[in-house]
C-alpha cells in the first residue's frame, strides 16, 4: 500500500497488473481499489480455475473487483478458433455481441476478383457487406464502389457473422473447410484449443513431454495424444501429415514451430498452417 500511495495511485485512471503471478495481480488490484475506488483495474490472469465457473466470482465480490480480466492464452485460442471456423480468413474480429464480424481475406479465385466492389450486390444480392479497406502491395486503400479487387489483395470486409462464408466465397475460392487438425504442442494454448475443437473436428496433438501427454489424455475426451517432437519430419509423415487440413504450431519453442511449419508448408503447400 505504501508503494501505491507513493506512486499517487489515486491520481491514476487505469492500473494494469501484468506480473507472471495471478495471485499477485489479484492482490495488487485489491489494494488499488482499497486506496482509490475510481481507478480502473486490469489484470492478467492465466489459471483456468479463475476464469470460469465459481472461480470467476472472485472478480465480482467486494474489494476484489477487477474491472478487466485479460487471459493471453484465451485470447490466442479464440483468435485461432475464429480463423479455423472461417476457412480462407486471415483475421476475424467479432463485435456487436458476436452478431457482426470484420474479416480479412486474400483475394484468390473468387467471383469478385478482378471486378468492381459495386458488383458484390449482384453476386450476393441478399447480403449486406461493406468493404472497409484493401491492402495492396503494402499500401492501404479506403475503397469505394468503383474500385476493383485484384488477385493478391488483402480485403477487409464487414458483414453479419452468418454471412461471412458467403462473402469469402466471392473473394477466395477454397475447396472445403477444415476437418482434420494437428496441433504441435500441448501446453496451455494447445490444450485449450484442442478442448474447444474436439467436438467438431478430428484433433491430434503432438507433445514432447511424456507427463504432459498423460495429463492431456486425462483432460481431453476426443483428441488423439501423441508423444514426440513436432519438428521431426519422420514423425509427421508417420502420423499422416498429408491427411491434415490444418497444422497449428503452438509449442513454447519458436524455432521448433518455424521448423515444423516450414516442413508442412513445403510438403503440403495447399494446407493451412497457424
Language model segments and positions:
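Cytosolic regulatory regions of ion transport systems
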Residues: 1-274
